[in-house]
Amino acid sequence: MFNAAVLTVSDRCFRGERPDSAGPLVAELLKDAGYQVVQTAIVPDEQPRIEQILREIAGAGSVQLLLTTGGTGFSPRDVTPEATLAVCTRLTPGIPEAMRCASMGVTNRAMLSRAQAGIRHGTLIVNLPGSPKAARENLEAVLPALAHGLEMLSGRPADCAAESSAE
């Protein structure tokens, strides 16, 4: 079992003007997949704040998977991808590519996603959209393969040649 954290990035949710619906949904999907969600938080669309909490969570060493939701669009305040790129030491471009590819079967607006994914220390950080529907679709597209990546990242023995339903 891996530990996970969910970070909602939204000015309106942070100010209490709108309930956070994507963050709890993402946390529930993770729990259903066997992850232990050990931390959730809401931050405003401010790059320094996002970077700070990404560094704090990844730096604590207790979370292997950190999912963000929100801030991946074209709005001038959508800066989650930039914050993610600023803190990650290794990028994992296949994850957002897979999410966009899967989402293109639902809507051609998927090509507008600027989501990123990467690694900081032993934590995989993945950006999800802020819409609950899109967050679910994107997470469901990649979740089956993430455990294998997390096993490799954590140094657990994993047979890279083994076939699985996630491939």
Regions found by a protein language model. Give the residues of each.
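Non-catalytic beta/alpha edge segments that cap or flank active sites
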Residues: 1-167
